[in-house]
Amino acid sequence: MKELWVILLIVSFGFLSLEIGLSTAILEIVAGIIGGNLLDVGSLPWIDFMANYGILGLMFLAGLELDKEELKKHAKHSLLLASSAYFVPFCVIFLATLPIFNLDIKQSALVAIALSTTSLALLYPILRERGLLNLQIGHVIMAAAMLIDIWSMISLTIIFAAIDYVTISFFAVLILFMWYAPKLGRWLFSRYRENLAEMELKFLLLILLALLFFAEKVMVSEAVLAFMMGFLFSEVLEEHGTLVDKLKGIVFAFFSPIFFFKAGSFMKFSIMNSTSLIVAAFLLPLSFFSKYLSSKVVFKRLRGGESLSKFVGVIFNFRLTFGIVSALFGLKAGIINPETYTAIITVIIASALISSIITRKEEGQIIQ
């Protein structure tokens, strides 16, 4: 019965998003908040598996959208934007939480990492809905968001992870896998093109599943790996538009809604208390405005218009994937307590909802 309620919530809020004009991904997160508090979603292990496929599929498709020539052309802009949008909020949050909440260096660093991220998984469908993926701004934003995830991943690894020879060995195998997978794909797609068994689609789904395995072994975000793999496959799939359309249909209709539902289910009202609410009330405006200003100012200096600069400042406040991953890591490792974890998740979800409402309200002013 729980499975039926999950699907019903996802479909209902999908229709609601079309009626009120909010992003489908955001409404699916809201569905997850409701479902996570009314249903025992943790007892449905299939949701975790499908949600993993959702983030992998989204990021793979996002990587496919990047144009290599545009990426090279605007690489410096993306790097500058990403560095400002990550390191400025990181420093502000880190320096503020140390004295105010009496956290130690590692605790403050983890909070700062979790709240300095930008979710490419949320940015991609929103840019897609607004038709920005084929424009220069779309390439700059997506590349910058990917770099922010990489900065977050590197920060978490340097500060907390213990890298050994096994990790290094798996990383070497991962590099070989990512190098040869597109070459194998080119041969398979040519040999088994448009067959009834859908071998090309099965191959892509297998590749995504393999990335999940490697992500766990080398402590790298699966979102980053899937995005990079999609970028490497972009030339291979140029002549296979039908295959890409099939993958988009599966991801956007089935896998990604479950991913966003699962993300919303992390926000538990039952474990909220006065401490977590106070911490969240302090961190939400601090993280939102530090991210907004650091993104807006830099993008405007890169010759972006006022409305576009505001838009970038707002959408870079979409935190989700790596923010939740960092918070879960800190909770399981005993670095942060449940109150701090709840506050982080609350800020991540709230900032995404606020950003979505703002972009919806000013949608007519974004693109001139």
Language model features: what each stretch is:
Residues 10-15, 29, 33, 37, ...:
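Transmembrane alpha-helical segments of multi-pass membrane transport proteins and ion-pumping complexes
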Residues 1-5, 44-60, 104-118, 166-177, ...:
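Structural signature of hydrophobic alpha-helical transmembrane segments
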Residues 28-38, 81-94, 140-156, 197-213, ...:
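Small-residue-rich segments of transmembrane alpha-helices in multi-pass membrane proteins
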Residues 73, 133-149, 154, 241-245, ...:
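Membrane-interface alpha-helices at helix entry/exit sites of multi-pass transporters
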